[in-house]
Amino acid sequence: MLEDNFLGNLIRRGILELIVLSAAVIFAVWLYGKISCRVCGGIDNRVVLLTSGTMLVGPFLIVNGIFKTFWGRARPRDIDLFGGSKAFSLPLEISNQCAWDCSFMSGHTAVAFWLLAPALLAPKKFRFFAVAAALLFGMTTAVFRIGQGAHFFSDVAFSALVMCLLIVAVYRRLF
């Protein structure tokens, strides 16, 4: 397992908090602009909805607020097949094997894939590379979370799918 891996721990305990902080900073700059009646740093209503809005709706509301809280799926490291005491449950099956901070879906993966939102705002010349880097970071985070025994493939796949669909839908609607 990748539980004691430096990069895995950095992703798990540091980088993702900085990503969430960046969404908060974007919101704060936008709010300052609203209060001072000007656009600051090019952050208008559309930018704040795409970035801070999708961070709130995706990782916080959908993934952590609904699925992780109410789905009850035990983490791989906690199921009997891997030496734990909990029973395996399917990804879309509501279970009673976990009471808090459950496996389905992956919050870390959702936050990592959120980088797609600011990547879509990159200048056209660099957008392909920004999107590729965002998706690569999301996939790397997903692989590390699986390797740490924290999530099944389906947990990270559903998180990635929810975030990509949400962000692309909001982007297409606004831009």
Region spans (language model):
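Membrane-interface loops
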Residues: 41-123, 129
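Juxtamembrane "helix-exit" motif on the non-cytosolic side of transmembrane helices
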Residues: 1, 34-35, 144-147
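Membrane-interface capping segments at transmembrane-helix boundaries
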Residues: 33-38, 172-175
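Helical transmembrane-bundle signal
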Residues: 23-26, 59, 138-145
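Hydrophobic, lipid-facing residues on alpha-helical transmembrane segments of integral membrane proteins
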Residues: 19, 23, 52-62, 66, ...
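Membrane-embedded catalytic cores of phosphoryl/pyrophosphoryl-handling enzymes
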Residues: 88-175
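N-terminal transmembrane-helix/juxtamembrane module of multi-pass inner/ER membrane proteins
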Residues: 1-27, 68-76, 80-87
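Hydrophobic core of alpha-helical transmembrane segments in multi-pass integral membrane proteins
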Residues: 16-34, 118, 165
